[in-house]
């Protein structure tokens, strides 16, 4: 899966779910590392996508 496809997939997953979604869940579903998810989230935020999160407790 290319990065653009993965970014779109992340957005679709986040919109479809009503509760919290962890980076670990996204990584597992998209078959990438957690670090890749963090980089992708950062790219989406830099592109102006309003994403908000909290550190896991």
Identify the function of each model-found stretch:
Residues 1-57:
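Short, basic/aromatic recognition patches that contact phosphate-bearing ligands
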């Amino acid at each position: 899966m290319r990065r653009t496809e993965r970014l779109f997939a992340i957005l679709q997953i986040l919109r479809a779910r009503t509760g919290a979604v962890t980076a670990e869940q996204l990584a597992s579903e998209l078959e990438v590392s957690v670090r890749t998810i963090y980089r992708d989230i950062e790219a989406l935020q830099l592109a102006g996508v309003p994403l908000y999160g909290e550190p896991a407790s």
